[in-house]
Amino acid sequence: MDMHCKADPFSAMHRHGGVNQLGGVFVNGRPLPDVVRQRIVELAHQGVRPCDISRQLRVSHGCVSKILGRYYETGSIKPGVIGGSKPKVATPKVVDKIADYKRQNPTMFAWEIRDRLLAEGICDNDTVPSVSSINRIIRTKVQQPFHPTPDGTPVSTPGHTLVPSTASPPVSSASNDPVGSYSINGILGIPRSNGEKRKRDEDGSDGSGPNGDSQSSVESLRKHLRADNFTQQQLEALDRVFERPSYPDVFQSAEHIKSEQASEYSLPALTPGLDEVKSSLSASGNADLGSNVSGPQSYPVVTESFASHLYLKQEPHEASLTPFTPSSLASSGLADIQPFQMALTVDASTPTYSSFTHHGPPYGQFGSQPLIAGRDMSSTTLPGYPPHVPPTGQGSYPTSTLAGMVPGTNVSVHHSVQPVECCSCLSSSKPCLFHCRTGSGSEFSGNPYSHPQYTTYNEAWRFSNPALLSSPYYYSATSRGSAPPTAATAYDRH
């Protein structure tokens, strides 16, 4: 119908709220009039399409469709939600009861209030407010802020309010806050008393400028706030704590160190312990071979049997050795048999070491059998021996090599052959297979002494001077004479 559109659309826009796209007038937030709703339904019964109804009545398509849809579904043309809105639960009766409960028990929870409303029959399951609704009621309608009056009596806004409990802090009066305009009384415009004004003037006269004024006011406030709660001794202790710097000093002074800690870990307290260790080490002396290696020591002869009765003595005239302490290798069962001895003689300035005698097959070819039955030399813990010695050749090195095991030493050895007795020399006129000669100073072949075991030691110990293992000084042919080459080959095969 056009009756709601006959008026001036501009006046309707200013009066009702606006004009829609089709030129019809509508009012913001208000439903369509019942007359228009009835006309939409009548045109729909006549078979007019919704789009034509919208053009004729100048009502939007959405509005026509919504009204017709609700009419076809419910048979009603009344405006409103289909299911209806939830009834209001925050009735004055419920709000009064909630305020009553909070006044009786200020710490009561919202869910407890809800259960009590149901238990007392004030609300049923359909009308009881939710927990969030109860919290909102308490926040907005029950706990109203109090506005104190100049005479100190609180003025509450009309409605449901709670009496302030004794646990809540009282509102500070004008005389308790010397800060002035930044106080509650200053913000609320409450005039200060004469005593407050006089105290304010005294604080202002004590300060020397703006900074002094603010500092004095802060100090007076601090003293005033603490005067009723702490004793004088407590105040002094608090002042000392606040005057202490916030960050500790990196270099801590001696006064912060505990006296017992300083006496326990001081250098004079530690010195007697060091002296005891030194005296115990020196007192043990030669009793324990592994405890002290500073003094010279002598070691017994280790003897082993040869297949042939051969007596050979090697005497190195000069040696510079680093002291080492090999363990005793003498065996009572082998000490009586001494067919082959090598004596090592050094200067008086160096420790004296007894000879180490090795056993093996004839013709001077040393085997790799252990010296002591049931014990391999690789398991010994000799301080002078390297820990990575291969077990197959541990018991087959001559004395000169043992003397050269210590890295960084230069050993100068001169071999001299002493008169030797063997059955080959005494029973035959042929040259002796073992080069037994009655003269001294004879030396042997000059071939490089390149045994694989000694090459391994040369690489492992990294000798600064490898001449001990590879130079021809070990055996030379200058004084060998007319010895057969077969004999030399047989002797030098090790």
Curated annotation (Swiss-Prot):
Keywords: Developmental protein, DNA-binding, Nucleus, Paired box, Segmentation polarity protein, Transcription, Transcription regulation
Location, primary (coarse class): nucleus
CDD domains, sorted: PAX
Entry GO CC: nucleus
GO terms, biological process: negative regulation of transcription by RNA polymerase II; nervous system development; positive regulation of transcription by RNA polymerase II; pronephros development; regulation of transcription by RNA polymerase II; segment polarity determination; sensory organ development
PROSITE patterns reported in the protein's UniProt record: PAIRED_1 (PS00034), PAIRED_2 (PS51057)
Domain of life: Eukaryota
Keyword field contains rRNA processing: no
Tissue: Expression becomes spatially localized at mid-gastrula stages and is localized to the nervous system (midbrain, hindbrain, spinal cord), sensory organs (optic vesicle and stalk, otic vesicle), visceral arches, developing excretory system (pronephros, pronephric duct, rectal diverticulum, proctodaeum) and thryoid gland. Splicing does not appear to be tissue-specific.
DNA-binding region, residue range(s): 15-141
GO molecular function ontology, one term from the record: DNA-binding transcription factor activity, RNA polymerase II-specific
Protein location: Nucleus
Induction: By activin. Weakly by bFGF.
Region (Disordered): 142-221
Region (PAI subdomain): 18-74
Low complexity: bias regions: 163-175
Residue ranges, annotated region (RED subdomain): 93-141
InterPro entries reported for this sequence: Homeodomain-like_sf, PAIRED_DNA-bd_dom, Paired_dom, Pax2_C, PAX_fam, WH-like_DNA-bd_sf
Aminoacyl-tRNA synthetase keyword on record: no
Job of this protein: Probable transcription factor. Involved in kidney development, acting synergistically with lhx1/lim-1 in pronephric morphogenesis during the tailbud stages.
PANTHER family: PAIRED BOX PROTEIN PAX-2, PAIRED BOX PROTEIN PAX-6-RELATED-RELATED
Protein name, UniProt field: Paired box protein Pax-2-B
Taxon lineage: Eukaryota, Metazoa, Chordata, Craniata, Vertebrata
Gene: pax2-b
